[in-house]
């Protein structure tokens, strides 16, 4: 049985969308499958569009692998990049990320 992972997506206006999904999927997949507004995912998870940009809660950064060079280059395309910006298609959920909290940008690039 695959572990369930809970993720909170917080919209710019403060609305929170709690998603419970299986470990092993990407944050982007979890958002799309659960109807989270604000994750466009135009490229379908190929790290080629930056329309799945999220802000990871600073307390979670150490639990994530650092961005790849490709992800870092794509993040240069987002309008409001921050030190805790990530592309949700590049983060695979594990049981260690249960309770992960993310902020969604006001608009995707």
UniProtKB/Swiss-Prot annotation:
Name the UniProt record assigns to this protein: Ferredoxin CarAc
Domain of life: Bacteria
One Pfam family per UniProt: Fer2
Subunit structure and binding partners: Monomer. Carbazole 1,9a-dioxygenase complex consists of a terminal oxygenase component CarAa, a ferredoxin reductase component fdr and a ferredoxin component CarAc.
Any one Gene Ontology BP term: carbazole catabolic process
Organism of this sequence: Sphingomonas sp
Record flagged with keyword Metal-binding: yes
PROSITE patterns xrefs: 2FE2S_FER_2, ADX
Cofactor: [2Fe-2S] cluster
Cofactor binding comment, as recorded: Binds 1 [2Fe-2S] cluster per subunit.
Entry keyword set: 2Fe-2S, Iron, Iron-sulfur, Metal-binding
Any one of the GO CC terms: cytosol
Its biological purpose: Part of the multicomponent carbazole 1,9a-dioxygenase (CARDO), that converts carbazole (CAR) into 2-aminobiphenyl-2,3-diol. Acts as a mediator in the electron transfer from fdr to CarAa.
Binding, [2Fe-2S] cluster: 43, 49, 52, 89
């Amino acid at each position: 049985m695959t572990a369930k992972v809970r993720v909170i997506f917080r919209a710019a206006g403060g609305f929170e969308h709690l998603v419970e999904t299986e470990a092993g999927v990407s944050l982007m997949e979890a958002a799309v499958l659960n109807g989270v507004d604000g994750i466009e995912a135009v490229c379908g998870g190929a790290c080629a569009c930056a329309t799945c940009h999220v802000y990871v809660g600073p307390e979670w950064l150490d639990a994530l692998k650092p961005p790849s060079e490709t992800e870092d280059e794509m993040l240069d395309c987002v309008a409001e990049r921050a030190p805790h910006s990530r592309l949700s298609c590049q983060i695979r959920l594990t049981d260690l990320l249960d309770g992960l909290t993310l902020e969604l940008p006001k608009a995707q690039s």
